[in-house]
Amino acid sequence: MRGEASRIADRESRDSLAPKLRDTREDAWRIGNELFTITKVLDDSIQLERALTDPSRPVADKVAVLTELLGDNVHPMTMEIMTDLVSRHWSRARDIANAVEDFGVDAMMYYADATGATLQVSVELSELHSALLNLPVVRAKLYDYQATSEARVKLFREVFSGKTLNKVTMRLAEHATCNLRRRRYLETIQWMINKFSRHMGESMVTVTTATPLKKEQIKRLVEVYSAKVGRQVHINSVVDPTVLGGMRIQVGDEVTDNTVVAQLQNLHRKVQTEATPA
């Protein structure tokens, strides 16, 4: 969890630079890739993270480190983002890498916007999440720290080679396994799904069922929950074969569980309560 200073630094930096990053349009693809690469470099060097976040070090010195590291090899917007980040205060040195990754995903979202693929990528990430729930062995290998990042990416490509995924979906999914960042693979994919949902101005409604939802069911759920929360919602359909009947629906912290298992558990609690002597 990030400290207060890091949360403020991340939010203010992204809020201030979002319009410029959005305006890069197709160039955002290059910027996002560069930021993912920088995230990996930072993760691999705590010394570099400390050099770029040391509060006692002048900002000019930190920018000099950036210039030596990146030179003229990156997009000007990438350099502007990094310069802004090193000028801010961070609770922990490693939090700057988190902020760089945030910007990387933002850049990919803006590229998706520019190419009219935002909704497609959001849906594909949700479908990918559901597919991997049913592939526990593959899922485990995608965040296997004993394997090389190259091996994990190769596995992902082999498993999903038959899918015609948008290149943004592919890049985000590969980033999630290439640079694990102390997270399980599906945690990263879910984080990206949530970011896309917020980006599109929607609320995320996660619906877990034993079999895929039909289009009519998704349409009805969108209508019901859009009316309930007062804004458009996105249905994140999760398929979990272990679910017995019904649906488990989560909106933020609110969970509605009408699966058979949940109903049996509620019945069991009710019986126990009634059987308890007064």
From Swiss-Prot:
Domain of life: Bacteria
GO molecular function: proton-transporting ATP synthase activity, rotational mechanism
The entry's keywords: ATP synthesis, Cell membrane, CF(1), Hydrogen ion transport, Ion transport, Membrane, Transport
Protein localization: Cell membrane
Annotated InterPro entries: ATPase_OSCP/d_CS (IPR020781), ATPase_OSCP/dsu (IPR000711)
A Pfam family reported for this protein in Swiss-Prot or TrEMBL: OSCP
Keyword Cell cycle included in the entry's annotation: no
Main location: membrane
Coiled-coil regions listed in the entry: none
Membrane-topology descriptor: Peripheral membrane protein
Gene Ontology CC: plasma membrane; proton-transporting ATP synthase complex
Subunit structure: F-type ATPases have 2 components, F(1) - the catalytic core - and F(0) - the membrane proton channel. F(1) has five subunits: alpha(3), beta(3), gamma(1), delta(1), epsilon(1). F(0) has three main subunits: a(1), b(2) and c(10-14). The alpha and beta chains form an alternating ring which encloses part of the gamma chain. F(1) is attached to F(0) by a central stalk formed by the gamma and epsilon chains, while a peripheral stalk is formed by the delta and b chains.
Function: F(1)F(0) ATP synthase produces ATP from ADP in the presence of a proton or sodium gradient. F-type ATPases consist of two structural domains, F(1) containing the extramembraneous catalytic core and F(0) containing the membrane proton channel, linked together by a central stalk and a peripheral stalk. During catalysis, ATP synthesis in the catalytic domain of F(1) is coupled via a rotary mechanism of the central stalk subunits to proton translocation.
Family: Belongs to the ATPase delta chain family.
Protein name: ATP synthase subunit delta
Gene field: atpH
